[in-house]
């Protein structure tokens, strides 16, 4: 019995029996549909795999929360005397939603590094030759990263008031209540979904984590800084336009509107409907581009 390998599709063909596996040119489309587990089972499996991988790395959990908390406490204390936001808002209060979005971004983006690792270990190639829609791979990775990002961002939002009670953030009024908690969680999930899809787009063509970190430094970190998270738009006209054209600006502004304790503090922000619309459109564009990129036949996908 001889066995040959179809290099184009990366599947085995049993030459003696004539059994052709999914992926060959003669494989019937009806058989492919019958062999496919559908869209959502692979999505659930891949998302669950991302969660298991994360919670097995306990140092990653500490680092994901520890660094943003240190940022917030130190910058909040250092700049509190020289900054007053809208409606006399303290810097600790102004920076609070910005740090929550920073946690969303870095957790979502870093979770997509697993794409590079999976390709190196051969797992990704196995998924690509499986009879599942390419959208399942994208959505599985994106949903897994989104869940992790939202959980960590929520953990920070609940830890913040506790830090204010012990004197580390005396000027904080978090704005998170039982009334607006569902809206906060829903909007965090939407922003996290968008950012994870963006991370997928960046990670997919990468061959090494070093290149991914370089993109993080020159593109994603400025994207967060120029979203109104760290400082509000100033007198500079060009800087104000850059901030307005940044899709993440509307994610930060939407979260500020939901958590606002003083309506006067958010009067200058984009309208709520605009924040929601831009965030949804950005997420749809990122996911659509990710599905298209994953579905392309290329030598890179086969590696």
Which residues does each PLM region occupy?
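Alpha-helical transmembrane segments and their short interhelical loops
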Residues: 134, 138-216, 266-293
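Transmembrane helix-loop junction
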Residues: 76-81, 126, 130, 161, ...
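Transmembrane helix segments
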Residues: 75-82, 203-249
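Hydrophobic alpha-helical transmembrane segments of multi-pass membrane transport proteins
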Residues: 70-75, 91-167, 199, 218
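Aromatic- and glycine-rich beta-strand/loop motifs that create alpha-glucan
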Residues: 16-67, 303
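Junction motif at the cytosolic side of a transmembrane helix
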Residues: 2-23, 162, 259-266, 273-303
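Alpha-helical transmembrane segments of multi-pass integral membrane proteins
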Residues: 36, 60-64, 97-102, 106-113, ...
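Short hydrophobic, aromatic-rich alpha-helical segments embedded in or entering the lipid bilayer
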Residues: 2-7, 40-48, 225, 229-273
